[in-house]
Structure formats: C-alpha cells, structure tokens
C-alpha cells in the first residue's frame, strides 16, 4: 500500500511499478480475501483505478474489477456500506469502456470486459436502490454520462 500511496507514485519513473502494485493488490482482494482487511483494502484498490499507463495491466485489472463487481461478496466490499463507493465504480466504467468517439480507451478495456461492465450496470439498475444509482450517475460530468449511455445502447 505504501508504494501506491506514495506522493511520487504517479510520476513517470514510478507509474509502471505503481500500476503493477495496484494489480497485485487486486489479486490479493480476489484470491486472498480472508487474509486481508477487506473492508479497507477493497475500497483502496478501487480508489487506485482506472489504470491508464500500462495497457496490459489496465486490461487485466479492469477485467478483474468487472468480475469482482459481479460477485455479491466482493461487490459489497468494493461498494462499501450504503454503496458509498458506487459513484467511483461507475466513474471508472465511464473512463475505461470504449465508445465510438474514444478510440484511446480501447486499450484500457477489451470487448469482453466492456460487455461484462455493461452487464454489471444493467444488473445494478435492477438490484440497487434507484436513488443511489441516480446519484452516482449524476455525479458524472455530461461527457462521461453520454459515454456510458452510448455503451449501454
């Protein structure tokens, strides 16, 4: 966690190591949940996303996020009590899902992951309190709202 939280973590000479550390943290969340303080580590992992510099790690970690959000136990750790991290998760989806007008995002998320994210959003629409989801979407700027709407079409 110290590597990820270091003030210099996002500087050019450190970004690859930082994104690899975030990837490792995600693997701990997914595969060693019982060995970590899940209520604090999962939100810390979410706060580090999206990955933007290492395309290989970005695709793997964003696919992992989609998997985690499709599992009720992991989802509860990621989103937190009262879905306090829901807006963050939706913002990440908006930033990484490819759209016709954002070809640079294609490298952050493959089509399979984009479909999993879309399915997760559809599932959230039917299972989460409407006011929580509406608040999360309204927290997005208009461009990100439009990007998500385009992905959902």
Where do the PLM segments sit?
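Alpha-solenoid helical-repeat scaffold
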Residues: 1-153
């Amino acid at each position: 966690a110290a590597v990820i939280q270091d003030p210099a973590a996002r500087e050019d000479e450190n970004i690859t190591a930082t994104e690899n550390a975030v990837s490792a943290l995600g693997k701990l969340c997914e595969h060693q949940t019982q060995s970590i303080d899940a209520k604090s580590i999962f939100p810390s992992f979410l706060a580090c996303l999206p990955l933007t510099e290492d395309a290989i790690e970005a695709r793997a970690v964003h696919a992992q996020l989609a998997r985690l959000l499709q599992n009720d136990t992991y989802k509860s750790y990621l989103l937190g009590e009262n879905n306090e991290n829901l807006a963050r998760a939706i913002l990440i989806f908006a930033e990484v899902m490819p759209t016709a007008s954002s070809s640079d995002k294609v490298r952050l998320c493959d089509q399979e992951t984009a479909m999993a994210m879309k399915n997760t959003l559809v599932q959230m629409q039917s299972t989460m309190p409407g006011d929580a989801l509406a608040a999360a979407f309204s927290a997005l700027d208009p461009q990100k709202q439009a990007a998500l709407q385009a992905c959902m079409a």
